[in-house]
């Protein structure tokens, strides 16, 4: 202890420093005091004004001011404007003005503000007629309230952050700063409530003050008037300059605009501003947009707290905004919130209108906006006292700025969208120019380019670039170059189809390698116009020749290249720049004769005109790769025949190119294709062949002819591939699969991959087999939402409703087989009536099948083609069959509604739409059970896109606490647990809406090919049913006629065969040893007809117009060659052919074997004949409708069998599963997939909101309706009122003293994810916690939280009246208010002696402890000081370990008091120790004498941590105010501060 004491004496010696070295000399000491200074707050404000009011340095900046002549706001360069945009002088004026505007919020009756600025007298006055300042003596401060708030720093009525205020005042500086920077400052106010009139004047920068003049005001109205004369010297001015007066005058207009219902007068003249919109008009008056039109302003008063106006800006983003009448010239969170909302909606419009432009980002949209915002924000925060930038987070605004749809629509029409698009177009062109090519002789880095030797040279205009379709075509072209040479011909292969640049995005164009390579090869330059042949000499090639296949895809490639050039350089098409190279599509050869055809219609015409066409060898060329190198050389040798030049025929060509490739021309394209189909139909009816483009004399082709005669075939083919037939409901790919399956007639399952190969072989499928495999998979799928009748059986994993069929296995692993229903739907008796397609001289699938029911309705269809699209829902096959029966009976069909196999939800009609609803039920315990999803909503997608977001994210509040899955591959079951109190809200909103369990199906896009192969639009399902019925009845008549003829022919054949056998057995007919001609003549003479079946088929094909009835018909032309005469004489070919044909007709008799002459065979033939005749009689007795009924009955019986089999298989699986899961736990798991019996079903309803959405979608079909189911801050879609309290987190069981903020709930829910509500927490001690709604981060450390808990804000004034220590055991410091420590400094800096009641020190004299008055601290020796500190430490130790007895405590206290008296120097009674504020107002000599005691008190802070620690354990210790400690570091946390009743240490 002695060593410690000596060390302490050494350190505390005034003659030595901490190291024991001599202290500095007196001269040095003086220099230190000069360097390290302390200023009062008043001195600091005057010395460093930029901290409080902004810079006072002179500068020049452009700002908005009011022009009296033009009566509008103008931008002007103003002097005395500092770097921070506001001069100090302007700021002190603004503080007074904002105070006047704030009074409107306190007194709604206030309606006048008067502002007078007198430059000559340097006087500014601000008057308002709102509630006056209370003219009453402040009980604590012992002064009048006006005196306190205008003459004492850090005084304010805005310190209670618990109160929601929408005023501008906040920190307690405002008006005092104006007082400090004024030579004279007068306050005059009248309070009607207190019936007093008050007036007081300050001077000399608030260092002097007059006595307040108080008088009775009687019944005078309330008012407050501030008159001040700025201290111009402080602002480096000699007088109020014109520029600063202009700025002050504009601020008057600001207040008139931002203060609703207030008349503002400036220098006696009322300002003509009645509303915020009038103020906005002052800014845009006389300003025009880029088209010379006046700017359009879009204005909306969103609520009582928000007004927003917007127009376009050509000077970057501009904003004029006010928060509680404060001009936030730098904006802030309120401006960002509004701007972001506008930008988000504008971007959605821009995405649709700017698909061909550069990628537009949000900040680029904002750059074109000029935003005006006037708002009232609850307790706003700013980044500085100048209040130019509002920093409060949007969640704490106290209100929301929800812009209406009407406002957003008006914004998109005010010119903002056009302005952004213009900028985007300019930006795109600028980037494209950089990507242009140039003329150069050698190019590097372009793979597969075979460059011409003269490309890019002086002879470049003689060069031709050949663009080929793929590498195989390039090989063909290179082979041909050996004929024409490589100097003037280059070759470049295209990989696939070029980009359609007309509607491609700017990014797509820039990143498309093929387009960029083409530009470099040709040397094209964006934005350059090529108007003459001389301009072509600037390119690397003078011509472009397109060498593509002569099929529909090749035509499309040609069109895309034409479109590429026309879109960027339309002038090039007017010059001889573009050509095409055509090759034969069919070649007919006979010996040395070869005929080439360049289109199929031309070949068909030749076949009709040439009788012996069957004697020619026909070869089809599917692509350029089919031609040999020899043929390539032949093509190039006859260049004139194969080279076709494109010719520009006028504006019509431009129109047709845009028609074919512009997305804007969708309606015109539909009309174009419809006209084409009608023309094909008309020519077919009158027996004309299709039109074709290339003839033997064709040398040039106009662009219009190319589009209308060649490119139209591709577009029509696209529709044929994408849109099904109304009759069989199949697309060509699906029809090819069914055709192959019927032809194969497999009895055993076949692998899907193998079946795909077989389809490609038998049906001439020219595309990849992978797409065929997916077509097979789709035909076999049977999950909910796919097929009502799957035509193929799924044997393996063909996909489920979990992922909408995307989870199917590879085609290599799954098998399929034709469904037993397929041949009942596509009846074999209809096969002979089908008209088949032919390709490559091969008979393939029919044009359409003839099902017994309209399969287009059974399985529905979706497809998008060129100019056309279709969507037809599924219907119940039983309903369809029933309606067909009603039509057969002559009755009106019943109305049918969409129906999906195994779908458990609800389908309800609404106008021309249907609402498909899932199934939901309410379970006990605030749970929702979802047991069915809308059709087309797949289980995995629903979980990820709907349920997952409901759990909450960083930006979205949670709606549910968790969800559990009990789904299978065929059923759906989610059990969703809601947050407490949410069920009633969700029920009110609609469970189906909140959980997105409703979708709509439109009935306005039902398009399909009719029986004439023309696209037809159907308005109602009944129209499809009726058209199918009419056609099918005709075909049933034809089927009956065909079957009757077939049975009669078969009976005649059997009868002839039986008669022939009888005659032969009776030896009545001798044919042996006779020539064939004699044999045939003998048979004809005896009445034997040629083959009756073949003869009937021939007649039937002519009558019914069928192209082919049986495969063996095609063999009639393949006759055997006549044998040469043995004598060598030439044979007459026609005569020999005729003889062979006649002989073949009697093969059914002459070709019978000897076994046919037996009696058994004869009897069998007669029996078969009788059976055919019986069948014929039965058939003749039936009508066509009867045949149809029989087919329908057989189909429905089989349908029941198939579905019963599926149910039995499912039941058997469940039984097996039940046995395997015999345990109790397993049984529970099995029953989890079954809907609960305790659920209350929620009846789906069509809400008004859904109706509005449907109607809006109907009005604007081109615009996709985006309906927000959830508010960004509220995923439930329920927007509670701004003042509504949010429910507390479920984990909190005890009742909270104060509702937590929404962000706290978010945090609790997000921390532990799905299982949050399942956790159990240990109950914590009940502590009074406080939320930090104003905190920007929303978080605080644990230690900070404890300090706030222990020092409640409600105890602010309790200390001053305290007489007992017990009242302060939980802490008496008011750490909840940030301004309290500043208030202390303010009072110290005040030049007016305040009453002692304003003391806020921790001394006992503040508590009115009179037993032993506090003494002024004096010098004490080091021993006394050391002893006092040691005793303080000893007093703390026992409390940490054990509890002392009462007598021991008293003894220690007395010893401590005795030592205190020994060490202190007494103070005379008259000089009672002053409060802390008074002590710091003494002169410099007094401050020097107090130097050592201050160091003593600093050392007493060593026990802070222990004190705080003990307070947590429930001891009687109290943590000092941390904010005070940070300021002064002099308070003590020891118990002696509060528990010594006899005496206490003073500062």
UniProtKB/Swiss-Prot annotation:
The record's keywords, sorted A to Z, are: ATP-binding, DNA-binding, Isomerase, Magnesium, Metal-binding, Nucleotide-binding, Nucleus, Topoisomerase
Q: Domain Toprim, which positions?
A: 463-580
- Gene Ontology, cellular component aspect: nucleus
Site (described: Interaction with DNA): 497, 500, 669-670, 731, 765, 771, 938
**According to its UniProt record, which reaction does this protein catalyse?**
ATP-dependent breakage, passage and rejoining of double-stranded DNA
Q: Where is the composition biased (Acidic residues)?
A: 1109-1123, 1373-1383
Task: Kindly list the residues the record flags as site (Transition state stabilizer).
Answer: 812
Compartments, record wording: Nucleus
Under InterPro entries, the record lists: DNA_Topoisomerase_II, HATPase_C_sf, Ribosomal_Su5_D2-typ_SF, Ribsml_uS5_D2-typ_fold_subgr, Topo_IIA, Topo_IIA-like_dom_sf, Topo_IIA_A/C_ab, Topo_IIA_A_a_sf
Biased-composition ranges, Low complexity, are 1331-1344
Look up keyword DNA-binding and say if it applies. yes
Q: Which residues fall in a coiled-coil region?
A: none
Q: Which stretches of sequence are listed as region Interaction with DNA?
A: 351-353, 996-1005
Q: Which domain of life is it from?
A: Eukaryota
Q: Could you say which residues bind Mg(2+) 2 here?
A: 549, 551
Protein purpose: Control of topological states of DNA by transient breakage and subsequent rejoining of DNA strands. Topoisomerase II makes double-strand breaks.
Q: How does it assemble?
A: Homodimer.
Family listed:
Belongs to the type II topoisomerase family.
What name does this protein carry?
A: DNA topoisomerase 2
Organism annotation = Bombyx mori
**What's the name of its gene?**
TOP2
């Amino acid at each position: 202890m002695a060593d410690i004491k000596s060390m302490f004496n050494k350190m505390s010696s005034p003659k030595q420093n901490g190291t024991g070295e001599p202290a500095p000399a007196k001269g040095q000491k003086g220099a230190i005091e000069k360097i390290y200074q302390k200023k009062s707050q008043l001195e600091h404000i005057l010395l460093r004004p930029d901290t409080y009011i902004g810079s006072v340095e002179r500068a020049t900046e452009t700002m908005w001011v009011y022009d009296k002549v033009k009566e509008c706001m103008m931008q002007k360069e103003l002097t005395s404007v500092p770097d921070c945009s506001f001069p100090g002088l302007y700021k002190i004026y603004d503080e007074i003005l904002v105070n006047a505007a704030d009074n409107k919020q306190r007194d709604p009756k206030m309606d006048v503000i008067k502002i007078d600025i007198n430059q000559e007298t340097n006087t500014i006055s601000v008057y308002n007629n709102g509630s006056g300042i209370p003219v009453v003596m402040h009980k604590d401060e012992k002064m009048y309230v006006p005196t306190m708030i205008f003459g004492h720093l850090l005084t304010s009525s805005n310190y209670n952050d618990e109160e929601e205020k929408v005023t501008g005042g906040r920190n307690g500086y405002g008006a005092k700063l104006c007082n400090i920077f004024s030579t004279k400052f007068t306050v005059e106010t009248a309070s009607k409530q207190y019936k007093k009139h008050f007036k007081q004047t300050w001077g000399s920068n608030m260092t002097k003050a007059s006595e307040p003049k108080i008088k009775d005001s009687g019944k005078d109205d309330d008012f407050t008037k501030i008159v001040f004369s700025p201290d111009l010297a402080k602002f480096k001015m000699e007088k109020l300059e014109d520029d600063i007066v202009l700025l002050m005058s504009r601020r008057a207009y600001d207040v008139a605009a931002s203060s609703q219902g207030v008349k503002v007068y400036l220098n006696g003249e009322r300002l003509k501003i009645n509303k915020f919109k009038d103020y906005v008009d002052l800014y845009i008056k006389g300003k025009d947009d880029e088209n010379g039109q006046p700017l359009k302003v879009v204005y909306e008063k969103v609520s009582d707290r928000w007004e927003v106006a917007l127009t376009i800006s050509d000077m970057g983003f501009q904003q004029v905004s006010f928060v509680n009448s404060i001009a936030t010239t730098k904006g802030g969170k309120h401006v960002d919130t509004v701007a972001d909302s506008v930008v988000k909606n504008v971007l959605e419009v821009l995405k649709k209108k700017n698909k061909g432009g550069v990628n537009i980002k949000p900040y680029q949209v904002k750059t074109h906006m000029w935003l005006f915002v006037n708002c009232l924000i609850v307790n706003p925060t700013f980044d500085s006292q100048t209040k130019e930038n509002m920093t409060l987070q949007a969640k704490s605004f106290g209100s929301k700025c929800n812009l209406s749809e009407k406002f957003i629509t008006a914004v998109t029409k005010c010119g903002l969208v056009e302005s952004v698009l213009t900028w985007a177009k300019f930006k795109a062109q600028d980037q494209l120019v950089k990507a242009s090519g140039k003329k150069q002789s050698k190019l590097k880095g372009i793979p597969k380019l075979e460059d011409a030797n003269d490309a890019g040279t002086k002879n470049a205009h003689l060069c031709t670039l050949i663009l080929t379709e793929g590498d195989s075509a390039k090989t063909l072209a290179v082979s041909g170059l050996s004929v024409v040479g490589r100097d003037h011909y280059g070759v470049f292969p295209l990989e696939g189809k070029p980009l359609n640049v007309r509607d491609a995005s700017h990014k797509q164009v820039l990143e498309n390698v093929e387009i960029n390579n083409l530009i470099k090869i040709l040397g094209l330059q964006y934005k350059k116009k090529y108007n003459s042949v001389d301009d072509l000499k600037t390119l690397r090639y003078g011509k472009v020749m397109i060498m593509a296949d002569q099929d529909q895809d090749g035509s499309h490639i040609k069109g895309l290249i034409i479109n590429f050039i026309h879109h960027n350089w339309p002038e090039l098409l007017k010059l001889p720049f573009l050509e095409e190279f055509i090759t034969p599509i069919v070649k007919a050869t006979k010996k040395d004769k070869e005929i080439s055809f360049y289109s199929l219609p031309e070949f068909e015409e030749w076949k009709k005109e040439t009788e012996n066409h069957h004697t020619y060898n026909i070869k089809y060329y599917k692509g350029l790769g089919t031609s040999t190198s020899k043929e390539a050389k032949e093509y190039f040798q006859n260049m004139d025949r194969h080279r076709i030049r494109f010719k520009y025929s006028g504006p019509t060509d431009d129109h047709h190119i845009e028609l074919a490739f512009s997305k804007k021309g969708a309606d015109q394209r539909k009309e174009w294709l419809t006209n084409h189909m009608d023309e094909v139909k008309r020519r077919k009816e009158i027996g004309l062949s299709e039109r074709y483009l290339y003839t033997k004399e064709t040398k040039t082709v106009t662009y219009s002819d190319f589009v209308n005669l060649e490119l139209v075939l591709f577009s029509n083919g696209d529709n044929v591939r994408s849109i099904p037939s109304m009759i069989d409901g199949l697309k060509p790919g699906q029809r090819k699969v069914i055709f192959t399956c019927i032809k194969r007639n497999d009895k055993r399952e076949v692998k899907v991959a193998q079946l795909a190969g077989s389809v490609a072989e038998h049906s001439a499928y020219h595309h990849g087999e992978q797409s065929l495999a997916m077509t097979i998979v789709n035909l076999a799928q049977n999950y909910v939402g796919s097929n009502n009748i799957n035509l193929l059986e799924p044997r393996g994993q063909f996909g489920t409703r979990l992922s909408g069929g995307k989870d199917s296995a590879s085609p290599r692993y799954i098998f399929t087989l034709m469904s037993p229903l397929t041949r009942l739907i596509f009846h074999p008796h209809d096969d002979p009536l089908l008209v088949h397609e032919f390709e490559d001289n091969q008979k393939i699938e029919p044009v359409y099948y003839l099902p017994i029911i309209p399969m287009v309705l059974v399985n529905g269809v979706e497809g998008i083609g060129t100019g056309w699209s279709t969507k037809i829902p599924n219907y119940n096959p039983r309903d369809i069959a029933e309606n067909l029966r009603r039509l057969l009976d002559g009755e009106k069909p019943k109305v049918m509604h969409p129906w999906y196999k195994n779908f458990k939800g609800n389908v309800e009609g609404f106008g021309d739409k249907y609402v498909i609803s899932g199934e939901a039920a309410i379970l006990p315990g605030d749970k929702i059970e979802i047991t069915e999803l809308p059709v087309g909503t797949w289980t995995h997608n629903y979980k990820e896109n709907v349920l997952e977001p409901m759990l909450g994210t960083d930006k979205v509040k949670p709606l549910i606490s968790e969800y559990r899955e009990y789904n299978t591959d065929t059923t759906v079951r989610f059990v969703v647990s809601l947050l407490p109190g949410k069920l009633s809200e969700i029920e009110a909103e609609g469970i189906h809406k909140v959980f997105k369990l409703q979708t709509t199906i439109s009935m306005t896009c039902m398009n399909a090919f009719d029986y004439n192969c023309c696209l037809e639009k159907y308005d109602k399902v009944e129209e499809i049913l009726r058209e199918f019925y009419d056609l099918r009845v005709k075909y049933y008549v034809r089927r009956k006629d065909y079957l009757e003829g077939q049975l009669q022919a078969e009976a005649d054949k059997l009868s002839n065969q039986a008669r022939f056998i009888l005659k032969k057995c009776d030896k009545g007919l001798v044919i042996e040893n006779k020539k064939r001609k004699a044999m045939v003549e003998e048979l004809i003479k005896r009445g034997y007809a040629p083959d009756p079946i073949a003869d009937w088929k021939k007649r039937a094909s002519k009558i019914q117009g069928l192209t082919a009835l049986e495969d063996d018909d095609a063999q009639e032309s393949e006759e055997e060659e006549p044998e040469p005469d043995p004598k060598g004489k030439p044979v007459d070919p026609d005569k020999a052919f005729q003889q062979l044909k006649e002989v073949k007709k009697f093969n059914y008799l002459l070709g019978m074997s000897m076994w046919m002459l037996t009696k058994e065979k004869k009897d069998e033939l007669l029996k078969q004949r009788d059976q055919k005749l019986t069948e014929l009689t039965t058939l003749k007795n039936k009508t066509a409708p009867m045949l149809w009924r029989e087919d329908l009955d057989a189909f429905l019986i089989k349908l029941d069998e198939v579905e019963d089999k599926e149910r039995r298989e499912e039941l058997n699986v469940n039984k097996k599963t039940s046995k395997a899961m015999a345990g109790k736990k397993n049984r529970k798991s099995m029953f989890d997939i079954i809907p609960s019996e305790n659920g209350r079903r929620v009846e789906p309803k069509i809400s008004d909101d859904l109706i509005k959405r449907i109607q809006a979608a109907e009005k604007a079909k081109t615009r996709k309706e985006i309906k927000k189911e959830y508010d960004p801050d509220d995923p439930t879609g329920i927007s509670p009122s701004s003042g509504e309290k949010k429910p507390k987190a479920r984990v909190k069981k005890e009742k909270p003293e104060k509702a937590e903020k929404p962000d706290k709930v978010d945090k609790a829910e997000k921390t532990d994810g799905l299982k949050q509500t399942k956790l159990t927490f240990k109950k914590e001690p009940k502590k009074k916690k406080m939320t930090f709604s104003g905190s920007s981060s929303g978080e605080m450390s644990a230690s900070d939280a404890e300090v706030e808990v222990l020092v409640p804000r409600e105890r602010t004034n309790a200390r001053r009246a305290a007489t007992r220590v017990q009242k302060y055991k939980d802490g008496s410091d008011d750490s909840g208010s940030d301004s309290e420590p500043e208030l202390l400094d303010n009072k110290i800096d005040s030049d007016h002696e305040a009453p002692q009641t304003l003391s806020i020190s921790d001394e006992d004299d503040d508590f009115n402890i009179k037993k032993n008055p506090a003494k002024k601290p004096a010098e004490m020796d080091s021993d006394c000081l050391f002893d006092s500190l040691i005793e303080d430490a000893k007093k703390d130790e026992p409390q940490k370990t054990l509890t002392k007895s009462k007598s021991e405590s008293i003894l220690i206290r007395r010893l401590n008091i005795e030592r205190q008296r020994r060490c202190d120097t007494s103070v005379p009674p008259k000089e009672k120790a002053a409060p802390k504020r008074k002590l710091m107002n003494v002169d410099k000599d007094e401050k020097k004498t107090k130097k050592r005691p201050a160091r003593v008190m600093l050392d007493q802070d060593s026990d802070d941590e222990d004190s705080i620690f003990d307070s947590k354990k429930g001891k009687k210790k109290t943590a000092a105010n941390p904010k005070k400690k940070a300021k002064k570091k002099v308070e003590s946390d020891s118990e002696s501060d509060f528990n010594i009743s006899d005496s206490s240490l003073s500062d």
